Amino acid sequence: MGTPAPAPTEGATVVTIVHAPACHFCADAQRTLAELARDFPLRVELLDWAEPRGERLVRDHRAPMYPLVLLDGVLFSSGRLPRRKLARLLATRVATVGA
């Protein structure tokens, strides 16, 4: 059937990236997430678009561009990763958990 989604790590946001070969937006998203992981609790899961689960996620979310990015299983973006929007969302999540 395919690889199941990872279970969230306590307090960490699970970020799933479905990437494609030679995708510069995909490489940029991975670099951005590595930087954000220094400030926020993240668990990053990389899936190739050709893997059964990657294909299913792209089909289910009708992603027109790569990378497809999900946060805790919910669609966040497709194509260029909106860095500031993601950082604001992660900051809000951390503040909410810490409150």
Where are these regions (language model features)?
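Generic recognition of short, well-ordered alpha-helical segments
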Residues: 27-31, 56, 81
